[in-house]
């Protein structure tokens, strides 16, 4: 659900008020996490987990759209780098903090803790994550470019260039590298805990 949500919610975020969009996603994710802490049924747990994944995916889409609305082409790469780093740092911190909570209070409190932090985060997003510069009285950072009609020859050359890019081996190597990197990352995230328990005796 998270993967499908990242795909579909990107289109929705483009057409939405990202303040409300991201706040809604984070708020519902937080509430679902609180519900997960009370759940005893496996089926209900799986359903709630899927719902959580869907609404979590609204966050990345909102942030990417926000970067495009608030920063110019020259600035966007730098701020995207900060955003990407914060995502990974935040994930690492959650492992440490939630693991500490679970080891002391039990697994249910891991969801309670995440839910409470999510509620606080939703409030912060609603207060400070604004939709567009215009909504705050600032000028738009994206000046519309005058469109130029391309001739048939230019259109053909453009389409040919696109096909050439898709045929470049380096593009496919990068795409496959990214795919395998994420497979390794999520395999470690998902199964690393079980490995440490089964093979290393951690509890």
Region annotations inferred by a language model:
Residues 2-7, 91-92:
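Residue-level signature of mid-helix packing/kink "hotspots" within the transmembrane helices
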Residues 17, 38-43:
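Helix-breaking motifs and short loop linkers at transmembrane-helix boundaries and internal kinks
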Residues 20-34:
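Structural signature of the two symmetry-related core transmembrane helices
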Residues 41-49, 173-174:
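Short hydrophobic/alpha-helical segments at membrane-entry points of transmembrane helices
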Residues 48-89:
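Cytoplasmic helix-loop-helix junction between adjacent transmembrane helices
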Residues 83-134:
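Helix-loop-helix hairpin linking two adjacent transmembrane segments in secondary transporters
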Residues 136-174, 199:
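Juxtamembrane intracellular "pre-TM" segments in multi-pass secondary transporters
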Residues 168-203:
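Extracytoplasmic gate region of multi-pass secondary transporters
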């Amino acid at each position: 659900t998270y993967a499908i949500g990242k795909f579909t919610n990107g289109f929705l975020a483009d057409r939405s008020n990202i303040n409300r969009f991201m706040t809604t996603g984070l708020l519902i994710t937080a509430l679902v996490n609180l519900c997960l802490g009370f759940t005893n049924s496996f089926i209900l747990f799986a359903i709630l987990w899927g719902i959580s994944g869907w609404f979590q995916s609204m966050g990345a889409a909102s942030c990417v759209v926000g970067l495009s609305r608030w920063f110019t082409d020259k600035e966007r790469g730098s701020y995207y780098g900060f955003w990407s780093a914060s995502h990974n740092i935040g994930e690492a911190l959650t492992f440490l903090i939630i693991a500490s909570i679970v080891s002391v209070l039990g697994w249910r409190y891991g969801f309670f803790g995440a839910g409470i932090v999510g509620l606080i985060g939703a409030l912060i997003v609603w207060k400070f994550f604004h939709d567009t510069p215009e909504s705050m009285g600032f000028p738009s950072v994206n000046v519309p470019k005058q469109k130029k009609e391309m001739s048939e020859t230019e259109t053909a050359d453009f389409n040919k260039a696109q096909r050439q890019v898709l045929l470049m081996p380096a593009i496919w190597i990068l795409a496959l590298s990214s795919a395998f990197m994420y497979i390794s990352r999520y395999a470690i995230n998902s199964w690393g805990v079980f490995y440490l328990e089964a093979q290393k005796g951690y509890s």
